Curated annotation (Swiss-Prot):
Belongs to the TM2 family. It is a multi-pass membrane protein. The gene is TM2D2. Residues 166-182 are cytoplasmic. Residues 1-22 form the signal peptide. This is TM2 domain-containing protein 2.
């Protein structure tokens, strides 16, 4: 079939060649633009959050826009931060007031018995957030764990309580020696310590809490 003196197949072939050439030019432009963007240093990586220069860039993001996807480090969930242990002032109220945070005492069974304080935390390495990366996280309980388990101590008290093993384990050395010499107070002291353990009246001497078994 001839259209305007030219075969239709010839026109189709020319059209396909022109389309192929256009696609090649488009791919070349896209790849060139992508390589320029990859090598050039961006001024802004997100709206309102400027990325700094140097190897410590992740540690000095600036927070300027509340609508930015970059949040303050202090708003990070617990799984993205690492916190120090609560500061122990050992009952020194003056030191606690000067520092502004810390624990006067540790331990407690009920929530109302446990002191709460702020602790120093910092964002984990590799987590991008707006500075400062070190901050205070509030409402941390003043409790510590030193390897004492309730079930283990209860078994010690039940089977070896007459020899004071339970109190030796908890660090009450003086009363443990007395319990050993009297063979558990002829059974009375042994029974009383069982009740104290169950009711929470007998705890580790260092003020720590029972370790949780998961």
């Amino acid at each position: 079939m001839v259209l305007g003196g030219c075969p239709v197949s010839y026109l189709l072939l020319c059209g396909q060649a022109a389309l192929l050439l256009g696609n090649l030019l488009l791919l070349h432009c896209v790849s060139r633009s992508h390589s320029q963007n990859a090598t050039a240093e961006p001024e802004l990586t997100s709206a309102g959050a400027a990325q700094p220069e140097g190897p410590g860039a992740a540690a000095s993001w600036e927070y300027s826009d509340p609508h930015s996807p970059v949040i303050l480090c202090s708003y990070l969930p617990d799984e993205f931060i690492e916190c120090e242990d609560p500061v122990d002032h050992v009952g020194n109220a003056t030191a606690s007031q000067e520092l502004g945070y810390g624990c006067l005492k540790f331990g407690g069974q009920a929530y109302s018995d446990v002191e709460h304080t702020s602790v120093q935390c910092h964002a984990l390495a590799g987590i991008e957030c707006a500075s400062p990366r070190t901050f205070l996280r509030e409402n941390k309980p003043c409790i510590k764990y030193t390897g004492h388990y309730f079930i283990t101590t209860l078994l010690y008290s039940f089977f070896l309580g007459c020899f004071g093993v339970d109190r030796f384990c908890l660090g009450h050395t003086g009363t443990a020696v007395g319990k050993l010499l009297t063979l558990g107070g002829l059974g009375i002291w042994w029974f009383v310590d069982l009740i104290l353990l169950i009711t929470g009246g007998l705890m580790p001497s260092d003020g720590s809490n029972w370790c949780t078994v998961y």
